[in-house]
Amino acid sequence: MAALVRGLMRRVAALPQAVRSVSGGGQRHEPYRPLPITSPLAGLPRNFRVREPPKPQKVDRWTEKRALFGVYDNVGILGGFQIHPKHLIMGPKWLRGWRGNELQRCIRKKQMVGDRMFMDDYHNLKKRIRFLYKRFNRTGKHR
């Protein structure tokens, strides 16, 4: 047994040692050029690369959101400034003429349209109500 261990130790000792140096050692991305001593990079490893800027992406300028941007801007001009564009936007039925925080809003939605919701949406709504209920009861000035 001892002879086996000695034999293995000789093999391990014969392996070449890794060369370490301050300049980084190992394979470089560019040929080695010595830096002047006054350089701010002297003594640092030279294994960093400068990345090129990303290529410009092609953007669809006529998506629905971009095409309809500013669609209600002329309401004041054409309508004699009688109505504000925010009054043209109708929200969901359960929110019209009603104000409240997010928990109250979710509970109201569950009461009014919960029976007609898809199962996944209903499940996510219940999870949100559970989370908000815990949060509102643990923190805030409304405790």
Swiss-Prot record:
Binding partners and assembly: Component of the mitochondrial ribosome large subunit (39S) which comprises a 16S rRNA and about 50 distinct proteins.
Swiss-Prot/TrEMBL keywords: Mitochondrion, Ribonucleoprotein, Ribosomal protein, Transit peptide
Keyword Repressor carried by entry: no
Pfam families on file: MRP-L51 (PF10244)
Protein known as: Large ribosomal subunit protein mL51
Entry-linked PANTHER family: LARGE RIBOSOMAL SUBUNIT PROTEIN ML51, MITOCHONDRIAL 39S RIBOSOMAL PROTEIN L51
Subcellular location: Mitochondrion
Family: Belongs to the mitochondrion-specific ribosomal protein mL51 family.
Cited InterPro entries: Ribosomal_mL51
One example of a Gene Ontology biological process annotation: translation
Transit peptide feature, positions: 1-52
Species this protein is from: Gallus gallus (Chicken)
